[in-house]
């Protein structure tokens, strides 16, 4: 039990001693009465740019909390129940083979870690390379355009998030989120991810964190195999029996399917095997780049160079009444770069990435428009995937091949003309670019909605619609185009023992929610099955 205090505001120049004094004053106690103080959340309140505050939420541990709280009447002070992940009792159903985890992104990593902690010794199969070899492969692709179809920005140890920003924000309310953060810190992530309101690890640090968790899984008896691709599943009478990995048939009764949102060949295999799935909504658009200083000044005003203020971010939304579509920023990367993120030959994809320091010149974000199954041709549950492929192919051709991206300045995009020269903002896309009209690789309604959104967002961030801001095509992998349907026990509704998990299954979005989903799936497996013999 702890006392939670919210909305403790400090100035930018205050140190943590001021925080402690304010806590003692609120609770009418001395600092000697406090046995422990945990910072739960730290955020920047920049609503008044001439008086920016650092806002804290804390948990205070002391003697006689209830007695103390009974005499304090403050809406920002309450009891906080400290909930730990409860120990799970193993089930009784016999399992002949060790559980298998396919995919080693956030969902697969935390499913495997949870299973390993409980003695289930999972076997992991990841189609891509380990994170060190994968990094070499990806950097080579960015340099010479040679795409490895099995190991790239989408596939390999760490998942797609390993080449993003390592963002740890989430909207889900689940006590497992705290466990995920604790495990990341144990594995080498900075301690502040536990309380920063917009926490991130950064691509550079995340790689080491992932390797350390892999070694922990192995220490606990798990097995992690790279360059190992799931090719087929076999089930009988609605019950999973085996899988094929790299041509080898493997007995399997419990399969955590954590394939990520870009494993299109796996989706196709599952569709052929009649695994229940549906098309789902997602969003497509472009990457937009501005000078990071412009965003900093807009968000922080004259304080934008203060040492306690990091590179500013933004989150923008707009609803087009005319088009009945949402336009929004997504995966905003302060001080980052736009990266080539393809995973199929002849199809172009862009994404954003930041290192931990977020200290590069440009701010970039996806600028995307919602699309739904009604926009996709046909009736197949894979029709959203084919929709993505169509526009990615157009973008590839528009860029001239070799994974160069089509680029257009915002001013030219708004006026439907090809750009001919750059302004202050230099495109950061890692595989080169060509000036092209982006309307040639996007649906007309997406182009129109983007134009509306840019005008609206310029009212919120002055300079958002500046003539020389950069648009890079195209962003299509905002979320999975498919949902793999599952029941209350988190199994496929028509294949017992198959556990669709994380972002690729359509049940998560981002590192934390995917990791939590992986833990929940592992818990269901543990509760169902006895330890493998």
UniProtKB/Swiss-Prot annotation:
This protein's source sits in the domain of life called Bacteria
Write one Gene Ontology MF term: oxidoreductase activity
> Pfam families under this entry?
FAD-depend_C (PF21688), Pyr_redox_2 (PF07992)
Q: Which PANTHER family does the record match to this protein? A: FAD/NAD(P)-BINDING OXIDOREDUCTASE, FAD_NAD(P)-BINDING OXIDOREDUCTASE FAMILY PROTEIN
**Under which name does UniProt file this protein?**
Uncharacterized protein Cbei_0202
> Which organism is this protein's natural source?
Clostridium beijerinckii (strain ATCC 51743 / NCIMB 8052)
